[in-house]
Amino acid sequence: MKFTIKRSIFVDHLNNVQRAISSRTTIPILTGIKIAVLDSGIILTGSDSTISIEIYISKEDESNQLSIAETGSIVLPSRFLGDIVKKLPEDQLTLEVQDNLQTVIRSGESVFNLNGTAGSEYPTLPEIDADSTYVLPGHLFKRVVNHTIISVSNQQIRPLFTGVHFILADEQLKAVSTDSHRLSQRIVPLTMPEESQGKALEINIPGQTLTELTRLVDDNEDIEMMVTDNQVLFKIDNVYLYSRLLEGNYPDTDRLLSLDYNTKIKVDAQELVHAVERALILSHQGKNNVVKLSLSQEEAILSGHSSEIGYVKEKLSLLSFEGDDLEISFNPDYLREALRSFGGQDVVIRFVNPTHSFILTPSEDEDEFNMVQLITPIRTPGN
């Protein structure tokens, strides 16, 4: 096996494939990258057994400066391969596998030898034989993920909550996530495949998969999504991302969302984010990481304290106030992340009482649940 390629192109593709590789894997060969050389191009593969990324580098694309002398396959240690290729002196490299699986990498006057493993020993990626292909615009998909990923749980006790629940039906994509302390929902329009008209698809995609996918796709690219019983495949041009789906029936979260309120405020999201970040300086030093929001017709106060450090109190500027006076306590990190998910928009926050979850929606779409964040308050003495 032997090929020559433009080094900078190879580095970029190696970096993307390495996103799927975990140093904590219990399967030694999965710490490596599989390189398969065909007559028409090269396939790079990385996997942690949950996520797999495969990239095809075509010989026909002249920008790759790819020439193939001999076909074959090899698995090379991911970390060393990446470090070596990044440091090579010239923007052209040659990689050659010898009979004993010794791999020689040459660039300019530099020569590296790496021990490899036969490509045939690398696990085979799943076959995705899907009835339908869903096309998702990259910019829209990234907004959906960025809005919902914040409520994905990092606790493996409830694996289902470590992902985002997707419902594709009725010409729309609905994405929901919750860690039982907060909830995020985003609904966007979707052109359904002809063969899926009148049908609904519900899947649970791991949060890690979605995070890596947003790093691979550009705003102006489309994502093709194909689903089987327990696998999903995302295709972006020459990049293929395979992922296992999370098993289980996601709970009905619609019942948690209501437009009812006793207190409603409208705020500049960015201004409130900055105020919360100032309060975080002290709240992060306390045992419970709690801040309190006090609302009335006269004023709005955000406060927090650490018994060891001190106290912070800031008067807020509201765009509008409606309803009853209220004092409510909550995790400030949750509010900061929720507000950030709306970008620069003004946000409407609805409160029922100090012990009831409160809901954030954009002011321009406040009476719909197309873009929602829900936060559960923290009970404090007096609440």
Language-model segment annotations:
Residues M1-N383:
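Structural preference for solvent-exposed beta-strand-turn elements
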